[in-house]
Amino acid sequence: MSRGLGDVYKRQDFLQRGVPAIADKYTRTRMALLGGADLVLELPAVWATASAEYFAAGGVQLLGKTGVVDTLCYGCETPEKELMQAIVEVLSKNASDYQMLVSSSMKQGNPFPAARSHALCSLLPSFSSDVVSSFLASPNNILALEYEKAIARWNSINSVHDHILSSMPVQRIGEGYHSTKTGVTYASATAIRNALLTPSENDGNHNHSMCISTGSYDFGLSQMLPDTSASLLAAFAQQNLLLDMDAFSFALYTRLWALHDEGCADFADCGKDLSHRIDQHLEHFLSFSQFADLLKSKNTTYTRICRALLHILLNIRQDDYAALWQPDGIPYLRVLGFRRDSSVLLSAIKKEASVPLITKVADASSILHGIAYKRFLHDVACADLYRTTSSMQIQTELPNEYRQPIVLV
């Protein structure tokens, strides 16, 4: 971006995979700032917990609306620009053919990822099927594609305003997305989470399903993360503040039970079939993760189930998705933290941003109105659910959004 500075947008306390982050957004913001980021902005929950398509669209909108960002840098497994652009063109110009092929493949019993791969291989005869299939097998590459699509859409809408975004794909190195190997220099996020969330067989606390093993946050962590991030997460683990999805099991069950008569079909990523399965199997509910595994089917992935259940928990409905692709979708920019020596960036955004900039939660009521304020309050409610769950886990009250200061380093 201009001025030689960089900002980062963070997904909230809840993630695109349909699970909570293991550490709260303020701790992760501090990690990002100490790791070199100049400014951290929050992606609202409706986008942060959505599928890759909407998640990427929200991220591009958020950065574009700062008025100062000119380049989006993202990681991918294989930065094959030519193949990415070819796929983006197919998805943009041959969307109906693509959807027809995907639908046909899924009717034959193939899950969506396989149907997507089959459709794109058919529509891209100039590339070998092995190359296309291998590219699509990586979740990071899928997100990279969605970023490219979102950037193309942003540029087509904003070209008259001379505010064009470019992309800079960076090839990831080290372990793969699903690798669980620890003690290596470039471990996957999965491996880091597993190292932190290893259950202790000797812990007799059964009030929640996740117990932190006293030694698990030390072995290999300093090899896998920068020193500042490793020490912050180690301290978090020592305080028993790390959360996994099963920490929200009771909250999810009570929510599903309360919706028994209404059903869940109106919630984002759910639909009538999944709503019916939820109703059928609710009596067998033991935990968030167990119930998601129970509900998965050949045509519905575990991640999709988790995302649907999270949307039910966070009250994100199909109607909320209507705004996700709209050019004016992101209604505000909320600052989670910044470096003191990069205040020039914050000043530039205050001057150039096309939507209100929120640096203090208490000021939002006088700055935001209508749907913008409604979305903000929803984000506050999501954060409060995460905070309350953490507070109950350690039996200590934690500061809410109105008392949580902005992170400065």
Task: Give the label of every model feature segment.
Residues 11-16, 46-48:
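Short active-site-proximal "capping" loops at secondary-structure junctions
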Residues 2-9:
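Short, small-residue-biased leader/transition segments that mark boundaries at the very start
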Residues 4, 36, 67-68:
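Short loop/turn motifs at secondary-structure junctions
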Residues 1, 15-18, 178:
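Short N-terminal binding/cap micro-motifs at the start of the first secondary-structure element
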Residues 43-409:
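Active-site cores that bind ATP or allylic diphosphates and position pyrophosphate for catalysis
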